[in-house]
């Protein structure tokens, strides 16, 4: 039983499972950023300063200083607002070390939303991914490898097929300690042993177009200039196509406390987060806990925050969604300083460190995937009733709702995005329409007579 110093995802290697972000990807992204909605967002954000710019790809100055797929602002055009309302909220992995799966499936679902392929919250199933593409399950895994397997495999189903009840309703897995999975025993034995859904029903299958694309981490350690260029590229990619998956080193000071002080931005060299005192810095104080994978939803700049014991500065950060529940951090979200303010705990520069056992650990990297096809409704295997948790997160009806979702053609909306958060067509809806039509006919006959 492993109960101490379990270094999850201790050597995340996105490189061998991905292909480089290509010139074609770059051109497609710039084409999307030149659309009217993004132009409107840019002009409103920088009115009077960069109003003459044609589109985001022309200059780094045309990117908004702050943007993320969670926060709705007064500058967002209606289509962007509609999509932001459908972006996944933070989930909780509890004592299962599956950030590699949970962050990946949520990010993929978000990309279906941003692409305008669904008009509901996808709620893709982490459990489905862990059963069909297991890797280490609760003992860690590789997000890029998972994306590759999803591309070549059946795809992904939502929580309407199978949800996280096996963990969230089990005292052996559920916890209030967000960092508990780093030292807990491997909880993979709690998972259902069979692939499939809880009940016999049709479910949407979500597929990705190709192997994952790596934005950073391809080849050897990046130079500083490459890192800065990749920061611009990642911002453009997130804005155009949705959140990305990022891996980074976690140190012992990465606790919920940092989100409450000093602009709420995580800086790796702070030694006293949570002490109630002004932040203090010590570059040698923090120990390595493991590697972590999260969803990168956007970026921003924290103005005039403390960066050393004697200095203050504006600090650019990535806005991220964690997998440690809504009671952690800023309701499940956090800001992490970009390179070079963080040199080790960051996304875009590959780093190697020596852990407390003398092992070299290598991490950092960002991967994305392309989506272009609407989900397809199909029947899936059903797991034995003995495999269904005794207590479920949702009512029985929840596990058949995929059949009631209707994918609307984007052309029905002049903004290119379906109206409404969720669209269902049920037998009761049909009955209402029929009764209304029949009433009109009877009234018409009565008037004629």
Swiss-Prot record:
* GO MF entries: cysteine-type peptidase activity
Q: Which SUPFAM superfamilies match?
A: Cysteine proteinases
Q: Which GO terms describe its biological process?
A: proteolysis
* E.C. no: 3.4.22.-
Location comes to: Membrane
Q: Which organism is it from?
A: Invertebrate iridescent virus 6 (IIV-6)
Any Gene Ontology CC annotation: membrane
Which PROSITE patterns does the record cross-reference, listed alphabetically? Answer: THIOL_PROTEASE_CYS
Where do the TM regions start and end?
429-449
State the family named in the UniProt similarity comment for this chain. Answer: Belongs to the peptidase C1 family.
Quick check: keyword Lyase in the entry? no
Keyword set, alphabetical order: Hydrolase, Membrane, Protease, Thiol protease, Transmembrane, Transmembrane helix
Q: Catalytic residues per the record?
A: 99, 292, 322
The family database entries (Gene3D superfamilies) matched by this protein are listed as: Cysteine proteinases (3.90.70.10)
- Membrane topology per record: Single-pass membrane protein
Function in brief: Probable cysteine protease.
Classification via InterPro entries: Papain-like_cys_pep_sf, Pept_cys_AS, Peptidase_C1A, Peptidase_C1A_C
Q: What class of enzyme is it?
A: hydrolase
- Key word Hydrolase present: yes
Q: What is this protein called?
A: Probable cysteine proteinase 224L
